């Protein structure tokens, strides 16, 4: 994968398999390619895939537009959620749900069903009902933006979740709330990829596997104990083993 502006190779020889029902964590130093991986999987512009494949339930997604990938069930929780002035949260989310349903040939979600589900999800995430009437992320705190990302995720019910440093900027209470929402989405039919720098998120979202990404490749894979080791020793020891 290359980034057009700099013609720089970012991911090279990366192999990753996340089975349905599992939560995998990716950790690694800055510049390792963690966010780039999330961008490539979701179809963000500015990146050229020069080889390899990425499949969801056996279907290659790399030639699909971002909205088609979303309709197939891929969801990315952004590290830095953007503001959308003039578009209320509930309008935005209901439009997204029904756009995906249309692509899949399903009936639209009715207003009463949407409102009931929205209230239930908002309550779990400690989101004020008035917040959902405001423009998307406009004037929201960092923690509110992250909780709103999880609200969208729970409303859309994707098949494959990518959380890109969702824990950044969260205090411990907000972190627990976000983790509760993510854990509520764990399901035998759903895979999750959690990208993080810190062990603390993995105290609440227990991964099945932890991968270390460095220089565009996964250099080591282990269980939750690998994240604990990284927290205690840093990346140098693991990087040295892979050298």
Predicted segments — roles?
Residues 175-188:
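Helical segment within the ABC ATPase nucleotide-binding domain
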